[in-house]
Amino acid sequence: MLENRVKTKQIFIGGVAIGGDAPISTQSMTFSKTADIESTKNQIDRLKLAGADLVRVAVSNEKDALALKELKKVSPLPLIADIHFHYKFALIAAQSVDAIRINPGNIGSKDKIKAVVDACKEKNIPIRIGVNAGSLEKQFDQKYGPTPKGMVESALYNAKLLEDLDFTNFKISLKASDVMRTIEAYRMLRPLVIYPFHLGVTEAGNLFSSSIKSAMALGGLLMEGIGDTMRVSITGELENEIKVARAILRHSGRLKEGINWISCPTCGRIEANLVDMASKVEKRLSHIKTPLDISVMGCVVNALGEAKHADMAIAFGNRSGLIIKEGKVIHKLAEKDLFETFVIEVENLAKEREKSLKD
């Protein structure tokens, strides 16, 4: 685990700590109409199962705002209300949810922000100042354009507004739709404030595009010690947002959990359908939370050398293969027996590691 994380002021969204020494939390956003409580609850359940820590819901009208009271009763995750344009919806939402997200570029005047702050103070819930490059307030957009400087100036201005109202229970996000502006904005603001950061690349695209952008922007920031909570925005399935986010946390050294998958690129030496087999192995063992390095190799030639540092490896040969544990061959089996035996061995190793951690 990396030890260079910037220590920020700690806030709480429900029972989830954000900032300070707290683990970096992941979140996503439902796409149902929030007033459709059954559909929204089903999506929140899916996110909970995927490993999300928090969930955000859109509040587009008064019906959505009023539905939050009932939704909060059944939500297994802390609930964040996402408010644009209509500050009065935030006043209603604050009575029920665990946090409010506002976009200072469209929420309105200082008086409206004060009303939202007062409502959040009363319920002791935090606010996210959600700055987006594409919707900056007029004075910052005209002066700086949709630049990192414009985003930072907007964030500082709004942070000062909240501080002047004696309110410091907030976090900040600075989102753009590309990697470089996102990184530069967070880097620029980090030394200037003590508040926790919500990381994200907005409108990042489909699974492929978003995974690349988010890994570069969020992963880069996390390795610099920047970031306290995060969302990977994907045009696609909810669960993928959490899956990719947790993978970024693992590979940036911020989360020691789950399997680190190692598999060779295909070449003329492979003796099996490696693409299908690697996918099959990963899917079958996706439930394991124990930190393990697991290798899936397409030939014995590579496996004996390249997989020797893995906790467990499988190597496919001509109608047979090897299972290697901590650098030593423990099974040579016919192809038909290889997969199930490998799964059992990995699950047993995970249990051994968990037991040793408890003893």
Curated annotation (Swiss-Prot):
- A GO BP entry: isopentenyl diphosphate biosynthetic process, methylerythritol 4-phosphate pathway
Q: Does the record bear Oxidoreductase in its keywords?
A: yes
Q: Which residues are recorded as binding [4Fe-4S] cluster?
A: C264, C267, C299, E306
Reaction(s) the record says it catalyses: (2E)-4-hydroxy-3-methylbut-2-enyl diphosphate + oxidized [flavodoxin] + H2O + 2 H(+) = 2-C-methyl-D-erythritol 2,4-cyclic diphosphate + reduced [flavodoxin]
Comment on bound cofactor: Binds 1 [4Fe-4S] cluster.
Q: Which Pfam families match?
A: GcpE
Question: Which EC numbers does the record give?
Answer: 1.17.7.3
Requisite cofactors? [4Fe-4S] cluster
Identify the pathway.
Isoprenoid biosynthesis; isopentenyl diphosphate biosynthesis via DXP pathway; isopentenyl diphosphate from 1-deoxy-D-xylulose 5-phosphate: step 5/6
So what does this one do?
Converts 2C-methyl-D-erythritol 2,4-cyclodiphosphate (ME-2,4cPP) into 1-hydroxy-2-methyl-2-(E)-butenyl 4-diphosphate.
The record's comment on protein family reads: Belongs to the IspG family.
The record's listing under NCBIfam families reads:
ispG_gcpE, PRK00366.1
Q: What is this protein called?
A: 4-hydroxy-3-methylbut-2-en-1-yl diphosphate synthase (flavodoxin)
Q: Write the lineage as a comma-separated list.
A: Bacteria, Pseudomonadati, Campylobacterota, Epsilonproteobacteria, Campylobacterales
